[in-house]
């Protein structure tokens, strides 16, 4: 059985972003139940030199939408990184899910061999589609997703593995 690039990318991003919305909703509810402004969560960090929750959500969104676009051979939409509230961050994740829904499975046919170029600060990374997805897109996506999860958990939100995985 051949597994499609669409199933390996779109379906994984969609499920995980849906779970991200779930844990963010639990974060907001937890803050309200403890009588503090949920937007405090947006600025939280695990360590002083780490990116805040807001940036973790923005990067999770970016890796999903940009990776799908690169695999499809199209330009990704540009999202301004101007979110400051939990409500705005939830809206961004929803907008990312909406975008993923516009990329048809047919656009990713043959993308395992597509040349992908990723501009970095000091160089351009060049990979074929499948190694790009396996070794760049998914690991980076999950790094930022799990960091967002950990920030909520660290701040007392009652979430666990089932919330993260969606089972």
Indicate where each model-derived feature is located.
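Long, well-ordered alpha-helical segments
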Residues: 20-34, 148, 152
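Short, highly charged C-terminal tails/helix-capping segments
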Residues: 159-167
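Aromatic-residue-lined binding/catalytic grooves and analogous aromatic/hydrophobic interfacial grooves
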Residues: 3-26, 39, 46-67, 94
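Acidic interhelical loop/turn segments
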Residues: 31-42, 102-133, 165
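Short, contiguous alpha-helical
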Residues: 43-76, 124-159
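Helix-adjacent hinge/juxtasegments
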Residues: 65-103
């Amino acid at each position: 059985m051949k597994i499609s690039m669409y199933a390996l990318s779109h379906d994984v991003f969609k499920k995980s972003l849906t779970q991200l919305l779930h844990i963010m909703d639990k974060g907001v509810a937890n803050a309200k139940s403890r009588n503090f402004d949920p937007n405090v969560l947006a600025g939280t960090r695990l360590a002083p030199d780490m990116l805040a929750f807001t940036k973790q959500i923005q990067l999770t969104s970016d890796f999903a939408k940009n990776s799908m676009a690169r695999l499809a051979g199209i330009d990704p939409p540009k999202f301004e990184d101007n979110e400051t509230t939990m409500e705005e961050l939830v809206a961004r994740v929803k907008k990312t899910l909406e975008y993923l829904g516009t990329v048809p499975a047919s656009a990713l046919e043959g993308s395992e061999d597509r040349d992908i170029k990723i501009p970095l600060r000091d160089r351009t990374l060049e990979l074929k589609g499948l190694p790009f997805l396996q070794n760049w897109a998914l690991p980076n996506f999950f790094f930022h997703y799990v960091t967002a999860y950990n920030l909520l958990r660290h701040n007392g939100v009652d979430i666990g593995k089932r919330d993260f995985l969606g089972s």
